[in-house]
Amino acid sequence: MTNALASESLVVAEVRGRVGCITLNRPRALNALSLGMIRDITAALIAWRDDTHVLAVVVRGMGKEGPFGAFCAGGDIRFFHQAALIGNPELEDFFTEEYALNHLIHTYPKPYIALMDGIVMGGGMGISQGASLRIVTERSKLAMPETGIGLFPDVGGGYFLSRCPGRLGEYLGLTGHVLGGTEAINMGLADALMDSGRLTGLWETLGQTPFESGEAVERWCRNHEQKVFTRVVWPLAEVDRVFSLDSVGAIVSALAATPGDWAAQTLAVLNKRSPLMLHVVLEQVRRARGMGLADALRMERDMVRHCFQLRPGMASETVEGIRALAVDKDHSPRWNPARVDEVMPEMVAPFFVSPWPAHAHPLRSLS
């Protein structure tokens, strides 16, 4: 894939010098991923993986005002909603192929450099957390906000969140808290900080520099980073104390009993989330902590299948969450159950039962 795709393409993939360059080109939707975009990114990465001329890959997002300013806001949740309601089989394809792409990035044999400027959420984290170099800026906003739509942190979220220090994985997964660039570095979700004003020059120079190896590309990018001299002040001891508790009910009770703004604000956020999915996410992150990436992605593929299946007598929490946030926009989801203490273990357990035998799992080939 040595030629640029047409400028109206949602993914522009081109080789510039000896670097494979990917631009997510859907700025009006904050580069939200469609199935076609996932397929285009995958095709480019596979072609470049086997092309000895290409030494490294760099990915960016197009902003509304031009290059950069937004990386990727996640998956196309309006598509999820419509596809779930009409039974569109492309919904199954979307998650299978997205998670396979996430695995491809994590295991890519050449340096894969993500320029994570602006919004980096959900699916945007999925195409950046596996990068060998994750560059953030002063404009970066990173999050896994899926509990806000009755979903869970997928795209490998259980895997990479559970590897954050202490119990930050549980905290970030349950709340969907948004991190700035420096915070993300402190928490192990980014590697380097760069002034956003330098990104265009970096991008242009990548295609003009006679690199000799992929490692040289990565080193060259690192030469543009800023030093992070300060650590973000976080109540890490409180996070660990509260989010290491055994259950969502215990976490909520501990927050209610803890004085201070952090506990009050965190409790207010959790009270807006799907009680069922809070229980599911806590279990997900803790299971994933002991899993490799491939197994964690297979688990998430099982989970997302259950999320979009309409439960007998109950609506899908995910369909309802998307309706409230992005379709009707009433911001009043009707969660079922409505309270944390109404969620029973038998409601959570089915999310972790695969609907496929191992030999037929859609991600069986991941290793």
Spans of model-derived segments:
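Conserved CoA-thioester-binding segment of acyl-CoA-metabolizing enzymes
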Residues: 1-60, 362-367
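Contiguous mid-protein beta-loop-alpha structural module that forms a pocket-lining wall or clamp
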Residues: 156-159, 163-214
